[in-house]
Amino acid sequence: MIRSVVRGIGGALPKKSLSNDDIAKFVETSDSWIVQRTGIRQRYIANEKETTVSLGVEAAQAALINAGLTIKDIDCIILATSTPNHTFPASAVEIQHALGMSHGFAFDIQAVCSGFIFALTTGDAYLRCGTAKRILVIGSDTFSRILDWQDRTTCVLFGDGAGAAVLEAQEIERGVASDHGILSTKLRSNGAYMDKLYVDGGPSTTQKTGYLRMEGREVFKYAVGMITDVVDECFAAAGMDSSQLDWFVPHQANKRIIEASAKKLGISIDKVVITVDRHGNTSAASVPLALTMAICDGKIKKGDLVMLEAMGGGFTWGAILIRW
């Protein structure tokens, strides 16, 4: 049978970091206030020359090197982003060109913070049906460009960054020791909650980009239940449960949400990858960046059972179970 295997992974961050103390210089907040409520200590902010595309290119190049491949080996690029360089064309096409790729195809997916989960699931489907052999899946966002920097409830939460994975179709014998790759995926969305987390602008309405707006307490109220339900569904689809898990890689939005979700799922905090303290919420880049850090730190190893999950505006949410 065909399995989608993560062949390589990489990440990219802007050059400039912004600490909680830095933010406290221009908005009424403090390091202790932010850390206590979110777990975030710093985030990275793109400069004028750094964009969703440039960060995406950097992450893609790192993933290709990690995979031992070149852009000539890639058939498709899927970019998850909510902050494209232009309304159109798709930023994925710009990344395709910047990488020197003129074959195959590229397109964007928009599912906010769940974007990488949606993109990886789409890539998995393309590989299993034979549309492509290798796909470059990227999550890249520059949320600093859509933040109201006078709103202390949102500007402290987000950072910029990109992460990428090379997904490859491999013939796998199911049930044997070498059986690895994506085992199950589950995606969900419900537009009834769109007013809980959104951007108050757009080309078809205000003709302006707008700013990110969020009802933080409402998001927290729904997040843990939605996340844990979809993770349980993902386990069930693969005939497994949380006791078999080696690593839990959640969306890095808020440390309290991460800890509450892990507790409800019965996953030891020692098995949870947490990078929100270093990066803040990088939206679609969150999960691949956390994966990259976990691999660089020597945590995730070949054969490990890894659960990815994310939740974003919409609401959108999803989970992916992978045998590394």
From Swiss-Prot:
- One Pfam assignment: ACP_syn_III
Q: Which gene encodes it?
A: fabH
Q: Which GO terms describe its cellular component?
A: cytoplasm
* Name of the protein described by the UniProt record: Beta-ketoacyl-[acyl-carrier-protein] synthase III
Reaction it catalyzes: malonyl-[ACP] + acetyl-CoA + H(+) = 3-oxobutanoyl-[ACP] + CO2 + CoA
Please cite one Gene Ontology biological process associated with this protein.
Answer: fatty acid biosynthetic process
Q: GO: which molecular function terms?
A: 3-oxoacyl-[acyl-carrier-protein] synthase activity; beta-ketoacyl-acyl-carrier-protein synthase III activity
Q: What does this protein do?
A: Catalyzes the condensation reaction of fatty acid synthesis by the addition to an acyl acceptor of two carbons from malonyl-ACP. Catalyzes the first condensation reaction which initiates fatty acid synthesis and may therefore play a role in governing the total rate of fatty acid production. Possesses both acetoacetyl-ACP synthase and acetyl transacylase activities. Its substrate specificity determines the biosynthesis of branched-chain and/or straight-chain of fatty acids.
Record note on domains: The last Arg residue of the ACP-binding site is essential for the weak association between ACP/AcpP and FabH.
Kindly give the Gene3D superfamilies that the UniProt entry links to this protein. Answer: 3.40.47.10
According to the record's subunit comment, the protein's assembly and interactions are: Homodimer.
Give the positions the UniProt entry annotates as the active site. 113, 251, 281
Cite the annotated pathway.
Lipid metabolism; fatty acid biosynthesis
- The record's top EC class is transferase
